[in-house]
């Protein structure tokens, strides 16, 4: 039952999201804006849509939960918050992310979304929190007819959106990709350039054993990474961020490396 749900996970998320708006009775302008953005993106399976959903949906859930005490936990607000949280949990599963990134693949590509590095968890949350706070502030000032304040915060929100959304979207563009020629590590966050590993260069792929000495290209993340062993030394160019995390130079010659996809490519 659960596996069948995950196979068609896009539909349960859509149904839950529609149910949220059907049972709610307290949406403000900002909540409606976030709900509409996420709802529209849920029908467009693509990495851009995944970013839009994962940026907008948490705001709806956060507002629904924050309103529970003021509503004295009446049934309708509780149901609204519960549906929003369940939808949010599904949205952040590896299966849901995989549906979106694979739908944007070309030809015979098979994309595996990479896990977020631990070091980016706090900056990512803070970037989202800034956007959320600014949007809610614009909504509040508009409701109170404080037009000057609303305009000022609105300008700041527009600039922050332009700067931060692009950075957040990069997390949805990090993939391990199976292509006819081999594998590609497509990661503009941790690598200075994408890395193509041809099939004949690969000696083996397996879950990394404890104590492995392979270079970690995952940026340190949760879960067990995949270890790729190469036939000969191969150049890999690190981004300044990964160089700082690994405390190495920006160009390495490696025979073993680690990547951390959200779903195993070893099946």
Where do the language-model regions lie?
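Hydrophobic core segments of alpha-helical transmembrane domains in multi-pass membrane proteins
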Residues: 29-37, 76-86, 149-158
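Anionic N-terminal interaction surfaces
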Residues: 103-177
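Phosphoinositide-dependent membrane-docking surfaces
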Residues: 183-185, 195-212
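A membrane-cytosol interface segment of integral membrane proteins
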Residues: 221-267
